[in-house]
């Protein structure tokens, strides 16, 4: 979406993507949720001492 609309603000992109996400069924969301879990586990394994500090 950002590539298609390079002048669009990040907040607008986030709102639109959030709206699209809500329209997806659980089955359509599942691959993304599974990939997020896999990446989270990989990150925890590679960086066990990491703590998020904003």
Curated annotation (Swiss-Prot):
<dbReference type="InterPro" id="IPR036910">
    <property type="entry name" value="HMG_box_dom_sf"/>
</dbReference>
<dbReference type="InterPro" id="IPR050140">
    <property type="entry name" value="SRY-related_HMG-box_TF-like"/>
</dbReference>
<dbReference type="GO" id="GO:0005634">
    <property type="term" value="C:nucleus"/>
</dbReference>
<dbReference type="Pfam" id="PF00505">
    <property type="entry name" value="HMG_box"/>
</dbReference>
<keyword id="KW-0539">Nucleus</keyword>
<dbReference type="InterPro" id="IPR009071">
    <property type="entry name" value="HMG_box_dom"/>
</dbReference>
<protein>
    <recommendedName>
        <fullName>SRY-related protein CH32</fullName>
    </recommendedName>
</protein>
<keyword id="KW-0238">DNA-binding</keyword>
<feature type="DNA-binding region" description="HMG box">
    <location>
        <begin position="1"/>
        <end position="54"/>
    </location>
</feature>
<dbReference type="GO" id="GO:0003677">
    <property type="term" value="F:DNA binding"/>
</dbReference>
């Amino acid at each position: 979406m950002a590539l298609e609309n390079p002048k669009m603000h990040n907040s607008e992109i986030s709102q639109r993507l959030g709206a699209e996400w809500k329209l997806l069924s659980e089955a359509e969301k599942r691959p993304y949720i599974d990939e997020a879990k896999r990446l989270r586990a990989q990150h925890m394994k590679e960086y066990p001492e990491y703590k998020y500090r904003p």
